[in-house]
């Protein structure tokens, strides 16, 4: 138990790998048809654009990338969802570690990965998935800006907000 306490980042990487692998396996093994929104996003991915009637383009770009890699099966369309949630949790760890400490970062990331909303969202591809990634990226940049005068953090903040806006317009509330 002492080793686990002394190496939270290693434990976190193991948790990321196990949780993400389980979610990817669940995508492949669960015969869940696309929901109406997911089907609409998939149809957008067939004709990429800079934006659509009701949503920005990021979701279509992600689906186009995943289907180019593995095909048009439902699990391929949703492929990036559990992967993005894994990255989002790790960025939450980085932000919480900067604001508090490594232990708080560990529990913040683990809580994010295990809450029912994230678990369910990992099985779907929606505009919330990439927006949460870029929202957490912007949060991490702000946390780093509190203690660093480096120019890279404001740039990362702008990138996070910009990509978040390309994911979901609700990023404006950030």
Where are the regions a protein language model picked out?
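Transmembrane-helix motifs of polytopic, lipid-linked glycan transferases
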Residues: 79-100, 137
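Start-transfer (signal-anchor) and selected internal transmembrane alpha helices
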Residues: 1-23
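Transmembrane-embedded, aromatic-rich helix segments that form part
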Residues: 155-159, 170-174
